Regions:
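Histidine-centered nuclease catalytic patch
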Residues: 103-131, 140-156
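A generic structural motif
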Residues: 15, 123, 136-137
């Protein structure tokens, strides 16, 4: 099977809520078992060819689209879902910008910064973490932004499900990126 650069399919529930990134093979299985409700995207991501049906003299062909919604109930309750945090997703949420000086930096020059320091019970959560450059993080030290006289230039927030799928930063096809971006909440930093 020939794999293209963009080899993952965005799996949705029937309402169009992102559920997972799945492989071409996994997506083809959904197509073959008729569990796909609808598809989207600018044409197939891949066309997979199988064996020949002797009775009909035809080869089996499965078109796998980059976005596919499956029949059945959603496995994800949106109100229970808090996206997993990673350093890179945090930096992308904050647009690689220090929350204290407002400068943009390369990933290697950024740190995850606890607004409320860990020593004071500050947790590793979306609402307590911001992106900081090494200099500002060192200057703020083990203090709150108020104590350090370093007010936050932007507020932390929990990314929506659509934002989270963009923040994962896979090599997303342009049509899939646009589909997700068109569903971002109003005021999203990612739009």
């Amino acid at each position: 099977m020939h794999h293209q650069h963009h080899s993952h399919v965005l799996q949705l529930d029937i309402q169009g809520t992102p559920q997972a990134w799945i492989s071409l093979e996994h997506a083809a299985l959904h197509v073959a078992t008729d569990s796909v409700a609808w598809v989207d995207g600018d044409g197939p991501l891949a066309t997979l060819r199988g064996g020949f049906n002797v009775a009909r003299g035809k080869q089996s062909i499965i078109d796998v689209h980059p976005i596919m919604a499956l029949h059945g109930a959603s496995r994800v309750n949106l109100f229970d879902v808090v996206p997993a945090i990673s350093k890179l997703k945090l930096f992308r949420r904050d647009r690689m910008t220090c929350a204290y000086c407002g400068q943009r930096f390369q990933e290697r020059d950024l740190q995850c910064e606890h607004a409320v320091p860990q020593s004071r019970g500050g947790r590793w959560t979306w609402m307590n973490l911001v992106t900081a450059c090494c200099v500002c993080n060192g200057r703020k030290s083990d203090r709150t932004p108020e104590e350090a006289g370093m007010p936050l230039l932007y507020l932390p927030y929990v990314p929506s499900r659509f934002e989270d799928f963009l923040l994962e930063g896979r090599h997303i096809r342009a049509d899939v990126h646009d589909w997700l971006a068109s569903r971002l909440p109003k005021g999203s930093r990612l739009s």
